[in-house]
Amino acid sequence: MAYRESFYRFLMTQRNPGSADDIAQFANNAQHDSSFPKQEEDYEKLSDYLELNAGYLPSMSVFDKAYQLYLDNMN
C-alpha cells in the first residue's frame, strides 16, 4: 500500500497568511488548532471533528473543497 500523507500535512501546504482565499484561511487557522487530528485521512472523521470543534471554519463547503484538492493531489 502506498504512503498517503495526512489531510493536515496537505492542508499546511495551502497556508498563505496574506491571502483572503477560503482554503488558505482554513489552513492558517487549522495550524493554530492544537486539537486538530493531524494524522487523520478519513473524510467522515475529519468532518465530524470540524463540525464540532472548528469555529474558525465559516462553512463546511470550505472543508469539502479542501478535501477534494487533497484527494486530487493524492492521485
UniProtKB/Swiss-Prot annotation:
NCBIfam families named in the record: PRK13672.1
Name of the featured protein: UPF0346 protein LGAS_0911
Family statement drawn from the similarity comment of this UniProt entry: Belongs to the UPF0346 family.
Matching InterPro entries: UPF0346, YozE_SAM-like, YozE_SAM-like_sf
Gene3D superfamilies xrefs: YozE SAM-like
